[in-house]
Amino acid sequence: MRAVQRGRIEGIAPIAAGSAADREAAMRAAGARAIYLGEPGYPECLPAIADPPDVLFVRGSVPAVPMVAVVGTRRSTAYGRGIARAFGRAVAEAGWALCSGLARGIDGEAHRGSLEAGGPTVGVLGCGSDVAYPREHASLIAEVERAGAVVTEYPPGTPPHGWRFPPRNRIISGLSRAVVVVEAAATGGALVTAARAAEQGREVFAVPGDVDRESSLGCNLLIRDGAIPVLGAADLIEALTLVIGPPVTPATGDHPSIPAAGIAVEVLAERLGLTGQAFLAWLGRSEVLGSVRVEGDRVYPGGR
């Protein structure tokens, strides 16, 4: 664990001279707090990666539920942005937290989709937590903080130099149970995130696209190399449910008594208090576990 020594955090280049007290004042001014590796509050899944950050500067609260990363190119198409937003909504409705990089294009739309559905979301920055980058996302960054957390390994005031972003991508994948790439060129940050996810043992998903479109080439290459293709929001939730399972909450953890004659799907959803993707996630997981069986529009007890 790195210690605060001689007015700086050991191992992180200082952005300005100052004492430890100055750093604490800067964090307070930024509304951030420092969470060190091994201390309470440090995200549980990060220590398992090869190179976890020794300190995280956090604004907001990191959600306790499993996270799913949805990432992609800044140079996105309207089609890709629509998919990213739909995926963000679906992830939130299923009960997971959305993680992304708060960048232009795919990242921003994924965050917006999660926020629209009232879900928790986490944005990982490649700069200080008090630096709005890109500037036009200042209000989005504030919304993400209110709904979840803004996280970075860089101290307040750190500028968004390009070389800082590839290292931050390991945090996006490290925080998440799975990584979904919506649109990506053959090179770029989204493919870095996918590569780090694979190294960390996370499942990688990708949206197939036009073979002649540059913004789809990265996704098509990922699928060629073994990533799981996803064809829409419902397909994504079904695949994620098989990989990580829905989070256990009072609603999704309950298995109501299902009569031998079965029960209509819509009636079961109402009894569970679940709607949309959240219900589909519960139903898919329950089928996998063998606790229910679906035939047409009715659900029966498992094992029959």
Where is each model-derived feature located?
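Glycine-biased, small-residue-rich flexible motifs in mid-sequence functional cores and linkers
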Residues: 28, 34-304
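Accessory alpha-helical DNA-binding modules that contact the DNA backbone or grooves
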Residues: 1-44, 289
